[in-house]
Design a protein with these regions (language model features):
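Short solvent-exposed beta->alpha transition segments
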Residues: 30-31, 35, 40-94
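Membrane-proximal amphipathic alpha-helices
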Residues: 25-29
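Exposed beta-sheet edge and beta->alpha loop/turn motif
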Residues: 84-135
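Bacterial lipoprotein signal-peptidase II cleavage site
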Residues: 17-24
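C-terminal motif of bacterial Sec signal peptides marking the signal peptidase cleavage site
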Residues: 12-15
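Sec-dependent signal peptide recognition
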Residues: 2-8
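Short, charged low-complexity linear motifs
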Residues: 2, 46-48, 107-112
Length: 135
């Protein structure tokens, strides 16, 4: 009886997931961009990567961004995690396939942009655009 209680406790403990950290298929470009940004602010780069177009350039930039984030102080990480996303403009560059989201976060207030594309019917972030600016 004692062992079954312990096993049950472990099953319950390890089956609990934070629903905010899980991947949800985005319904539109804004959903994909917002989820990518939010997961990045929280330091959840594995989850953020699920909202990103999978290519070597994007993976390079996500890895670099992740390393930079991990070098920040715990205080800074907490501030990023609590930050809200302030979207200033959403531009449908190519309707139903390419959208650019201009945003900042409430911690740094630095204007940034992400490009979101529809790839194989799913909205994903083309992260390299953030650094190159090329459509």
């Amino acid at each position: 009886m004692k062992y079954s209680t312990i096993i049950l406790a472990f099953v319950v403990l390890f089956s609990c997931k934070n629903p905010e950290d899980e991947y949800h298929t985005p319904e539109n470009a804004l959903d994909a961009g917002r989820e990518f940004i939010q997961q990045s602010l929280k330091g959840n780069f594995n989850t953020a990567g699920k909202y990103m177009l999978q290519d070597k350039d994007n993976q390079y930039w996500l890895d670099r961004f992740s390393k930079e984030f991990s070098s920040k102080s715990e205080h800074e990480k907490a501030q990023f995690s609590k930050a809200s996303i302030n979207i200033s403009e959403v531009s449908d560059v190519v309707p139903d396939s390419v959208t650019v989201i201009n945003f900042s976060n409430s911690f740094t207030k630095v204007p940034q942009k992400v490009k979101v594309v529809k790839h194989n019917g799913v909205w994903v972030v083309d992260f390299k655009y953030t650094f190159s600016g090329n459509l």
